[in-house]
Amino acid sequence: MTFTFQSEDLKRDCGKKMSHQHVFSLAMEEDVKTADTKKASRILDHEKENTRSICLLEQKRKVVSSNIDVPPARKSSEELDMDKVTAAMVLTSLSTSPLVRSPPVRPNESLSGSWKEGGCVPSSTSSSGYWSWSAPSDQSNPSTPSPPLSADSFKPFRSPAQPDDGIDEAEASNLLFDEPIPRKRKNSMKVMFKCLWKNCGKVLSTAAGIQKHIRTIHLGRVGDSDYSDGEEDFYYTEIKLNTDSVADGLSSLAPVSPSQSLASPPTFPIPDSSRTETPCAKTETKLMTPLSRSAPTTLYLVHTDHAYQATPPVTIPGSAKFTPNGSSFSISWQSPPVTFTGIPVSPTHHPVGTGEQRQHAHTVLSSPPRGTVSLRKPRGEGKKCRKVYGMENRDMWCTACRWKKACQRFLD
């Protein structure tokens, strides 16, 4: 009994051991499998983390690169050279322009008496030494530059009260050898506006002024001056005046000095019937003597019309006191009109004999017109395209009427 019991116990123990070994082996296999799976999962997780980190790095790079301001493409060397060339050209043009190179002119340079008597006004500069001579004419007429003089030639004309601006005379003499740059002359043509109303011919400098003149004087509209239906545009035209010729004409005429004309009043004998023009010729030769540049006194009234008031010369009384012993004369300038009207009164009178009498010589000195003015004949206001065809048929008007000028189709 005991043996059987022990054998059964051994069998049970062996069976238990075998089962335990089998279970252990199974457990070991399962542990190995789980360990392998864990390793594989860890490797996969590691790879996933690596890929995620790489993606995050790429995203960060993209964000950073999008925020960085990329500088523009640099210019090529040729473009830089072209920019330098253009800048140099601009600088050279500015440095050689007459507006920059021309030195300032002293307006109050002292003049000697000889230049005043001669009528030429020297205009000097403080640094360059260029001199230019201009006749006494309008201030708007620029003087023509003359070749430079030496440094010693303009020393007497410098003002002692105004020293030079720190420039030595050696430097000034060096500047004299440079070629003077000719200054640009202003445009001498000036546009004026002439009234085309019959027997009017008034010339003004602005279109608004001539329109107001036509509206108020000729059309008789006294109401609102700003309101206009455009009718006055048909009664004026544009003309061009040469201001240089006007200034030359003004400079050629000078007022006669009362001291010369009153010093020796002309006495005339009794004229014969056959020699009536002799005193006039004498008076004319007397008036053409060298004239002084001194300012006219109260014995003279000098009336100078401007270019835009080019009307026929009108004799204006020179003084309210008229004495029969004076000789009146009038110098009239047709175009440009400059009218000098004066009555010189002689302070001393020669004794007049019974057989002598004084004459009032009226001499008119006229010179040919110098300004080339294209003046058209004033048209009448009877027939015009606007009045013939009407405002509604503008296509039938002539070109002048379409452009609001004087009618060219219906002439007087």
UniProtKB/Swiss-Prot annotation:
A zinc finger (C2H2-type) spans 193-218. Disulfide bonds: none annotated. It is found in: Nucleus. Residues 98-167, 255-278, 351-379 are annotated as: Disordered. Residues 123-137 have a biased composition (Low complexity). Residues 318-412 are annotated as: Sufficient for binding to RE2 sequence motifs. One of its GO terms (biological process) is regulation of transcription by RNA polymerase II. The keyword Metal-binding applies. The keyword DNA-binding applies. A motif (CR2) lies at residues 401-405. The modification Phosphoserine is found at S225, S228. Transcription factor which binds to RE2 sequence elements in the MYOD1 enhancer. This is Zinc finger protein 704. It comes from Homo sapiens (Human).
